């Protein structure tokens, strides 16, 4: 095998046509890490014999122990193509050597933020789908994320060995199963028609679908078989490819192809006849140890085995034979090289997704052309904890220019605004490193189009940042990432020994760096809160916190707490008025719920404060039935200027209105961050400023007078508009055999869940159940479910939506009012809610 050095890798890094940056994405347990192993083995990093069992990219102890991937891990692979195989390659290339930067990402939904970070710095994705389970919820979520980032997918149908060994399906049935899986994936991809990307769907007959068995380390695309038969029958390779998939049948008796099954017993579909049956035959021969038949068959295929390998029996024999005949690495790496874009191609169409500034300045042009001599543009997508405790590598991708050891860079954080000093640092890179699985190799410099890890920047980057070098023209940062899940589960942590407090504070800072999604905050009552995407995610984070970031100091954690949101379900019963502290200014306001779907549109970023007001008012008028003029009078969104609440100006001819606009908005940001019920964020409320009466002297209507008044009037208008609590709801997908359905339903009913879809997977005994489950009830759900179904059901929870609670929090004794009292008690507020009379004034 090739053992390559860092210098060789560095040489290929300059050939930007020969680089492929790709991530491996899939549903949990569909075999990503196992498949990645075969690729790593081909590059000579681990031995072929153990591939499939090592899971090289699961570098953490708890990953190996749980058998799941938690963090996304990068590896650089070197691969040399033969001239023969490159004959049909039409794109630009420099020589035969290729560099593949591969990132193995987690499939478990709690870690989907890791996937987002991986996707940002790659251009192509290998989507792994289990041939029997098919396209699952998480496959769909991740695929949509990838297409949203304009990443070109190729598909592999994995766990083929199950078809031959476990289920013993016959050819036609297998073909139907595979074609259904591919069709389901294409349905998702078809919704992303992008003129720049072209057609993103995958087709076996074009070579963009592979069939693999990660555990046994073999895989094929139809290209492999087409090549083999083309020389044998003397037909053109491309013609043979088309015949190996779809409605093409071959009858060996008459030696003719036809478009439909002629009904004769020997007539079979092309795929079955030429791909499926030969594999099935060889596997059967190996498993039955009929070696006298096996060697002549292999000789025909041109496969030679070493003498010691001929001694093997049963499964090990089959594994070696299949690996020698159809090595997974060759099939998959060739598919990536042929069908995934190089950085040079990809950055042309990705630049508008990546760059925030004008698309014609020098930085955008450097990204578009992937120019190594242009200005540096580098996006850090995550921080990786180094082996010496407390230090981090900044891991990211160079989009333009070069990054080298000792170079001075400008670090632009997520809140940086061009032309201002906020969130901007200048620092030099201590050294640049490339990642090769468990070890790192230091290199002098890394040119654009590659992934890189840097040492020495960890004090200045929290989660992600953009790096550029010093230039006269300020660069705009690269867009921040959008996560598909939100941190809704929180725990309070404290130290067992009070003297460990400084360790805890330091540890929380490091934890916030190491995970792209965790939010660590400190409440006013002084407790430290850690928020994550779900139970498993939090568990892993707290384990990291205790073992890695606090040096093993013990921590106590509270029961998990769920964030709620506050909303209203009706228009205010009357217009409420509040007076300023000096009694000279009066604000009149009403609250009303937003239209259906508007809050979600703001969350997704389709409507936001930075949009062009003309476009925004058009969307609001057409989709949500707003008045055209009203849509132009939105003052602000909140909380944090982008949240799903807004203030709209409904005043007619009021003097000095513009002077107090900023103060009202400031009061609104404050109020929408902590509502009157339990100081939780507001959601989906539209506040209308009806009238304002102001003092004529400017000194009596300053911010100190208006801001608290605005906050009080907002609270009063919310309380008069039938306030309600919103609770977060998971969508749970459960796969289970029919016998386990009863247990699933009973557990869901205890937990206030309800099933909204149940379907049987065609061709399998499994049922797919989708249900809604309130996050509050989800703790311990998976262990209860496994107990009730004796381990046959496997749940996946994804945050889905906010559900309004039907009970009224203002009436004592209802479920909502008990919840409000609990939250207030936990936050150290008075248990009784502040009455309306405190917020509303009489004339």
From Swiss-Prot:
One of its GO terms (cellular component) is nucleus. It is an enzyme of class 3 (hydrolase). Belongs to the TRAFAC class translation factor GTPase superfamily. Classic translation factor GTPase family. This is Elongation factor 2. SUPFAM superfamilies: EF-G C-terminal domain-like, P-loop containing nucleoside triphosphate hydrolases, Ribosomal protein S5 domain 2-like, Translation proteins. The modification Phosphoserine is found at residue 837. The modification Diphthamide is found at residue 700. Residues 17-344 form the tr-type G domain.
């Amino acid at each position: 095998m090739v053992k390559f050095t860092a210098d060789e890798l560095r040489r290929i890094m300059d050939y930007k046509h020969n680089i492929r940056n790709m991530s491996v994405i899939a549903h949990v347990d569909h075999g990503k890490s196992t498949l990645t192993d075969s690729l790593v083995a081909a590059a000579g990093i681990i031995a072929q014999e153990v591939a499939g069992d090592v899971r090289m990219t699961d570098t953490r102890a708890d990953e190996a122990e749980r058998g799941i991937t938690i963090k996304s891990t990068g590896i650089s692979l070197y691969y040399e193509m033969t001239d023969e195989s490159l004959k049909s390659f039409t794109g630009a290339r420099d020589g035969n050597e290729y560099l593949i930067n591969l990132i193995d990402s987690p499939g478990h939904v709690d870690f989907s933020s890791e996937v987002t970070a991986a996707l940002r710095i790659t251009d192509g994705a290998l989507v792994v789908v289990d041939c029997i389970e098919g396209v699952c919820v998480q496959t769909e979520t991740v695929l949509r994320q990838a297409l949203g980032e304009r990443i070109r997918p190729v598909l592999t149908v994995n766990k083929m060995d199950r078809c031959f060994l476990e289920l013993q399906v016959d050819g036609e049935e297998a073909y139907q199963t595979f074609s259904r899986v591919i069709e389901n994936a294409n349905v998702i991809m078809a919704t992303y028609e992008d003129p720049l990307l072209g057609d993103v769907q995958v087709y076996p007959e074009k070579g963009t679908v592979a069939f693999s068995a990660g555990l046994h380390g073999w895989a094929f695309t139809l290209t492999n078989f087409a090549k083999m038969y083309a020389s044998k029958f003397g037909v053109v390779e491309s013609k043979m490819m088309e015949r190996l998939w779809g409605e093409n049948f071959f009858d060996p008796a008459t030696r003719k192809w036809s478009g439909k099954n002629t009904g004769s017993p020997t007539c079979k579909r092309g795929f079955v006849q030429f791909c499926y049956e030969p594999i099935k035959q060889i596997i059967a021969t190996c498993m039955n140890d009929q070696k006298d038949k096996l060697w002549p068959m292999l000789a025909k295929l041109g496969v030679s085995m070493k003498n010691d390998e001929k001694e093997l029996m049963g499964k090990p024999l089959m594994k070696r034979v299949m690996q020698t005949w159809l090595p997974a690495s060759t099939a998959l790496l060739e598919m990536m090289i042929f069908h995934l874009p190089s950085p040079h191609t990809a950055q042309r169409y990705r630049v508008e997704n990546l760059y925030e500034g004008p698309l014609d300045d020098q930085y955008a042009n450097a990204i578009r052309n992937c120019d190594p001599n242009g200005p540096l543009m580098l996006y850090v997508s995550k921080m990786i904890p180094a082996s010496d405790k407390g230090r981090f590598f900044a891991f990211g991708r160079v989009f333009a220019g070069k990054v080298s050891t000792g170079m001075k860079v400008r670090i632009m954080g997520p809140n940086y605004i061009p032309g201002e000093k906020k969130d901007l640092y200048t620092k030099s890179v201590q050294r640049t490193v490339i990642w090769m699985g468990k070890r790192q190799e230091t290199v002098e410099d890394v040119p654009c189009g590659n992934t890189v890890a840097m040492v020495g920047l960890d004090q200045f980057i929290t989660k992600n940042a953009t790096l550029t070098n010093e230039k006269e023209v300020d660069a705009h940062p690269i867009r921040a990432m959008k996560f598909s899940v939100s941190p809704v589960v929180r725990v309070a942590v404290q130290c067992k020994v009070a003297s460990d407090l400084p360790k805890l504070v330091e540890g929380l800072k490091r934890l916030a760096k190491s995970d792209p999604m965790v939010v660590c905050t400190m409440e006013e009552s002084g407790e430290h809160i850690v928020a994550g995407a779900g139970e498993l995610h939090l568990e892993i984070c707290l384990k990291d916190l205790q073992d890695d970031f606090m040096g093993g100091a013990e921590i106590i954690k509270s029961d998990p707490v769920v964030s709620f949101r506050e909303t209203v379900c009706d228009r205010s019963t009357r217009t409420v008025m509040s007076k300023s502290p000096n009694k000279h200014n009066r604000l009149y306001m009403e609250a009303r719920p937003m239209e259906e779907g508007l809050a979600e549109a703001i969350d997704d970023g389709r409507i936001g404060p930075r949009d062009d007001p003309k476009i925004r008012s058009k969307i609001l008028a057409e989709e949500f039935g707003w008045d055209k003029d009203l849509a132009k009078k939105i003052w602000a969104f909140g909380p944090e200027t982008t949240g799903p609440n807004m203030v709209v100006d409904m005043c007619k001819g009021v003097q000095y209105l513009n002077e107090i606009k900023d103060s009202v908005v400031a009061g609104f940001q404050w109020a929408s961050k902590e509502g009157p019920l339990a100081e939780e964020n507001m959601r989906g409320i539209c506040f209308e400023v009806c009238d304002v009466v102001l003092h004529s002297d400017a000194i009596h209507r300053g911010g100190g007078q208006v801001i608290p008044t605005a906050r009080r009037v907002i609270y009063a208008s919310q309380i008069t508009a039938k306030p309600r609590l919103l609770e977060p709801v998971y969508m749970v997908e459960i796969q289970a055999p029919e016998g386990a359905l009863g247990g699933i339903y009973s557990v869901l009913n205890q937990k206030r869940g309800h099933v909204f879809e149940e379907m049987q997977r065609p061709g399998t005994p499994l049922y797919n159940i989708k249900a809604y489950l309130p996050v509050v009830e989800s703790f311990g759900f998976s262990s209860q479910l496994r107990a009730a179904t004796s381990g046959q059901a496997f749940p996946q929870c994804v945050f889905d939506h906010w559900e309004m609670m039907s009970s009224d929090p203002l009436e004592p004794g209802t479920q909502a009012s008990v919840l409000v009292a609990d939250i207030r008690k936990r936050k150290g507020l008075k248990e009784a809610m502040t009455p309306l009379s405190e917020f509303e004034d009489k004339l």
